[in-house]
Amino acid sequence: MPQARGEGATPPTSLPNPSLKGVPLPDNPNNLEPLTREWLAAIGEDPDREGLQRTPQRVAKAWAYMTEGYGQTLAQVVGEGVFAAEGSEMVIVKDIEFYSMCEHHMLPFYGRAHVAYIPGTRILGLSKFARIVDLYSRRLQVQERITTQVADAVEELLAPKGVAVLMEGIHLCMAMRGVQKQNSSTTTSAMRGLFRSDPRTRAEFMSAVQGTLRGR
């Protein structure tokens, strides 16, 4: 597999400027503090008791981090990490950990993402794949959408011959409430270009990641 060159290098001037946009965060994330106090009172807690006095501040800080993807763009997280291709073989980045918040119950889901592409004229610094996954995971999300957004981003950046994204997640909204199935996991995929049209290419990718899938 070809390796991306050092990320400090200057990318070719002909590369497009990525245009996927983020959503600005509120001017004052601390607005979450009074809302958290109200929420604590609504569930029957005393927000002024010793163990909860600083909880609104902690919650506001935690949610600012867990949703920082809203305030970022694809161009910002990739920076100068796109380079001219030096090969055309499949590149696979496996076992990218992700953490996100379910938009339906605002409970966490987490797991691993595997991203592959077949270069055209451009390649991407390997660490940027993790940054792209974080960009879309750190929002209120569903796993299906993250999978599609990561594939869309790689396509926009590189115009490759093919892109594959496979994500496997454990959803606490399913494990700790509702049906309460702690051993269940969800797998989603997005296949583009050669990964969709050529069964051999798709099989090569699936074979490479098979051993990392949960329960395999």
Curated annotation (Swiss-Prot):
One of its GO terms (molecular function) is zinc ion binding. It comes from the Bacteria. CDD domains: GTP_cyclohydro1 (cd00642). It catalyses: GTP + H2O = 7,8-dihydroneopterin 3'-triphosphate + formate + H(+). This is GTP cyclohydrolase 1. The keyword Hydrolase applies. Residues 24-33 have a biased composition (Low complexity). Zn(2+) binds at C102, H105, C173.
